[in-house]
Amino acid sequence: MKVQYECLTCMANQCQRIVEMATQDMDIRRRAMILAAKLLAKEYNENAIPAIAGSLIFLELYKFLGNDDPFIEYKLKSEEMARKVADIIKRKLKLDFELAVKLAIIGNVIDFSVGFSPEDLEEEVEKMLKDKLYIDDSKELFEEVKRAENILYITDNVGEHYFDAILIEKIREISNAEVYIAGKEGPIINDATVEDLKRAGLEKLGKVISTGTRIVGVPLKLVSREFMEAFNKADVIIAKGQGNFETLSEINDSRIFFLLKAKCPAVARELKVPKGALVCMRNKFKL
C-alpha cells in the first residue's frame, strides 16, 4: 500500500509522541522535531510505503534522542493487561477456530499509533466480541491451515501476541504443520520483538524467528535469510496488523491472510471497509 494523504500528519504526530516519551528537555524536543521534518521531506513521496517510511524516520529519531526503546513502559503495560485479559477469555469462552481468529484480530486494537490505552483493553475486547468480521475469510483460512505443512505467523504489537497465542493453539489442534512465529529483530514503536515472543512463551507453540529487521511490517528486500526461507516454504502466511498489510498487500500471493482492525482511514479505504472494521482477508491478488 502506497502512502495516502493522511499518512504525512500521522507520521508527524507519531514523531511528536516519540519525542515526548523520550525526553523532557524542551530544546532537545524542538531539535528532534526539526530533524523529523527533514526526514519526512525525504521519506514521504509517491512511491513510499507508510510502514517503511515511518520506520526509517522513527529509527533516526531514536538515534538522535539516544533512546533505543521509548515505548518500553507502554509495551510493559500492554503486555500485563493483555496477558490478564487473554487468561480471562480462555476461562470464560468456549473457543473454536473462528472465535480464535476473531480474538486475534481484536487483539490488534493494542496500538500506540492510534492512541490506544492498555487500561481500556478488557472493555474494548468485550465490546468487539459482539461485532462481526466485515471481511470474513476465516473458513478459507481454516481449510488451508488443515492441509498445510508449513505455516508462517507474522506478529504485530506487544500485548496482541497473547491473543495470537490463542489462535496458534487452535492451529496446532487442527494441523500438524510446522509453525514459524516471526517477531522484530529489535524495538520499533510497540511492535513485538523476538524477545517479547519468547518471554510470553510462544516458543512452546512454534519456532520463533526474527524478521531480521526493525522495520514495521515485512519489507521482503530487508528481511533475514531465515525469515525468507520460512516465507518461501510456507503454505499459509498469517499477517497481523496494518504494517504487515501495508508491506505485503501488493504481493501477488494468495497464501497470505491479513488479520487486522482497520484503525486508520487510509487502510480502511484501501480495504474498502469502514474505519474500525475487523478483517480476516485472503490476499486479494491470486496466484
UniProtKB/Swiss-Prot annotation:
Changing D156A: Abolishes catalytic activity. Its cofactor is Mn(2+); Ni(2+); [2Fe-2S] cluster. Phosphatase activity is strongly promoted by several divalent cation ions but it is suggested that Mn(2+) and possibly Ni(2+) represent biologically relevant metal ion cofactors for damage-control phosphatase activity. The [2Fe-2S] cluster does not seem to be directly involved in catalysis. Activity is strongly promoted by Co(2+), Ni(2+), Mg(2+), Mn(2+), Ca(2+), Zn(2+) and Cu(2+). Activity is inhibited by EDTA. SUPFAM superfamilies: AF1104-like. Subfamily I proteins are distinguished by three conserved motifs: the CxxC motif localized near the N-terminus, the GNFE motif localized about 40 residues from the C-terminus, and the KC motif localized about 25 residues from the C-terminus. In the crystal structures of the subfamily I proteins, the side chains of the cysteines in the CxxC and KC motifs face each other across the rim of the putative substrate-binding cleft, and the GNFE motif lies deep in the cleft close to the metal-binding aspartate and asparagine. This is Damage-control phosphatase PH1575. It comes from Pyrococcus horikoshii (strain ATCC 700860 / DSM 12428 / JCM 9974 / NBRC 100139 / OT-3).
